[in-house]
Amino acid sequence: MVYGLGEALKNLNSYCQERTTRIRNSLSPSRPSMSEATATGSSSSSRASTTIPSTPNMDVTPTVEDPRQNDNNASGMTRDEFRQYGKETVDYIVDYLENIQKRRVVPAIEPGYLKDLIPSEAPNTPESFESVMEDFEKLIMPGITHWQHPRFHAYFPAGNSFPSIIADMLSDAIGCVGFSWAACPAMTELELIMLDWFGKMIGLPAEFLPLTENGKGGGVIQSSASECNFVTLLAARFEVMKELRQRFPFVEEGLLLSKLIAYCSKEAHSSVEKACMIGMVKLRILETDSKFRLRGDTLRNAIQEDRNLGLIPFFVSTTLGTTSCCSFDVLSEIGPICKENELWLHVDAAYSGSAFICPEFRPLMNGIEYAMSFNTNPNKWLLINFDCSTMWVRDRFKLTQALVVDPLYLQHSWMDKSIDYRHWGIPLSRRFRSLKLWFVIRMYGIDGLQKYIREHVRLAKKMETLLRADAKFEIVNEVIMGLVCFRMKGDDELNQTLLTRLNASGRIHMVPASLGDRFVIRFCVCAENATDKDIEVAYEIIAQATQHVLHDSVKAVIAEEDEEAVALEEMVADLNITETPEKCLTRQNSANAAESGQKLERQLSKEEILAQKQHESLAKKRSFLVRMVSDPKCYNPKIVRHLNMANHRKMSQDLYRDRTLMQTISHSQRPNRLSQSPGSAGSAFFDDDDDRIVADVQTGLQTPI
């Protein structure tokens, strides 16, 4: 066996020497080969009895062509092309943002529009940048909802600014993945400093700041507020489970977990509910006061009730600036209760948190000193592109102990002196998000950012004033920041019609919410450079659409009355009754009541049952956005028309059903009803037996025998 291995190594050595000789000969043809050099050495030295191969000269380096110099299309884009196309793209971005008001706010397309426009297979050969950009404008842009449009007033702002775009370009060019300090030291350290800067800007207590001397607090940038809510819930769950395992070492963890219960208000973001679902803990959704705020007494009573049931309260998620109406839970009441009961208090200020850089808004977070964690989204209201959600914790060790996974290949020699942000969230890979926060804060300054926030609040107040001055509208929320919730004075159906008409026009975009079981329309100031003119134009669009809705509703009522009269007349004619429709209905109802002794109850349709259940559940659950931007019914006229046609068909079917029921009732009241057979004249009222059977079942009458 040893002999075989030695022979193999000898053969391998000979092969390597031969390959070295060939390479040297191909690079330097004039230089003598290894065998020639060996022969020369033998003739000049009589003492050499054997031929000794010379050591290969390894200073000869093959000249490898730089692939970046390759000018063929296989490289995707050369450096010179990138310079050219990069400048063209910057020009395109500037032109797009300058002229965005000329575009529809929402696209006039239907779901699946792109599938038939893009080939089903990827191209085998490279395509030019010009071709790709042409298709981008022709195929992609028609399907874009323009969040930077001056009349985009849905949801909350999507932060955007030129400094942030440039910072993202640099981050993408660097292309680092900063899961640890060693993976990219500058990324980790800049994030640490930016969380300290921003925390001071919004007035967080020093216990939360990363650079507080001898402090336990810390900050991290997550991908979204949803992730912030989730990781804080996991940290709170880990903390309480650790204590429960010590107190009840022989109880199964699954049983302990089933006893945990968290709390939030009905106006809290849906991500709290999702976090509890994933975390496998119960969630109790609490009622709010008349201003849609969670109060301390409500929480205290819920905690006591659940403890009486054997449950273990452990987590409370509060909101400063709710999604539906920008209301503020009362932290000064909730905080002491959480401290008294040793509950983890989390504060979600995704939208409003950026406004706390203005001192006049900081009283809204009185009680923050009781919180264990806090998050806000600069990518909403601080001119920073998505994604950038900042989160702080009072004790960073309670967060990281719930998330630490430390395989060998991720360890490094500086772990005891640095922060590894991979232990602060769900993903391992992390982007250089702090770079855009640094660029924006430096290039706007705190003064510039404060001016931006205050201008949005002023414009929201202006819209509130315009709507209050119009007798057709009412304001539903307390306008504190940049969100106005309003509705037409009337029923929910009118307001739904108004919103559908507004979004279908493509001139403005808003979304609804449900407040106090009422359908309301949300108007949020979103554009960076929004002006008084933009607000006035938005109000005029709303006012004009309202006039059309009111006019159409009056016409619809008149038309509906005419249709009912015609239907009754047709029914009378079919039944050969000479009385008026009103008298006919009265006589029929009286006779039916006398015969059966009970009133016939109209059976609810499937749609009506679902609507009733939704209405009942809405009073118990948190408010939600009824329709999202992905719902084409909000803005697509084609689908709106299709739905209207479907409703018309349903009305026609309902009318036919009612006529059939009336015929059945009338037929059942005739004296000779029992003497008639299915094939007799009594069956002449029905087109077929199925109609008669359905009518009999729905009216509760027996089929004639």
UniProtKB/Swiss-Prot annotation:
The keyword Membrane does not apply. Required for the decarboxylation of tyrosine to tyramine, a precursor of octopamine but probably also itself a neurotransmitter. Involved in the regulation of egg laying, which is inhibited by tyramine. Also involved in controlling locomotion and head movements. Due to its involvement in octopamine biosynthesis, also required for crtc-1-dependent regulation of AMPK-mediated longevity which requires octopamine signaling. It catalyses: L-tyrosine + H(+) = tyramine + CO2. It is an enzyme of class 4 (lyase). This is Tyrosine decarboxylase. Disruption phenotype: Mutants almost completely lack tyramine, have fewer eggs in the uterus and are hyperactive in egg laying in the presence of food with most eggs being laid at the 1-8 cell stage. They also have a reduced backing response, show more spontaneous reversals and fail to suppress head oscillations upon anterior touch. It is found in: Cytoplasm; Cell projection, Axon; Perikaryon. InterPro entries: Aromatic_deC (IPR010977), PyrdxlP-dep_de-COase (IPR002129), PyrdxlP-dep_Trfase (IPR015424), PyrdxlP-dep_Trfase_major (IPR015421), PyrdxlP-dep_Trfase_small (IPR015422), Pyridoxal-P_BS (IPR021115). Its cofactor is pyridoxal 5'-phosphate. GO terms for cellular component: axon; cytoplasm; neuronal cell body; perikaryon. GO terms for molecular function: carboxy-lyase activity; pyridoxal phosphate binding; tyrosine decarboxylase activity. GO terms for biological process: amino acid metabolic process; carboxylic acid metabolic process; octopamine biosynthetic process. The gene is tdc-1. Pfam families: Pyridoxal_deC. The keyword Membrane does not apply. PANTHER family: GROUP II PYRIDOXAL-5-PHOSPHATE DECARBOXYLASE (PTHR11999), MIP05841P (PTHR11999:SF70). The modification N6-(pyridoxal phosphate)lysine is found at residue 380. Belongs to the group II decarboxylase family. Expressed in the gonadal sheath projections in between the oocytes, in head RIM motor neurons and RIC interneurons. Keywords: Cell projection, Coiled coil, Cytoplasm, Decarboxylase, Lyase, Pyridoxal phosphate. PROSITE patterns: DDC_GAD_HDC_YDC (PS00392).
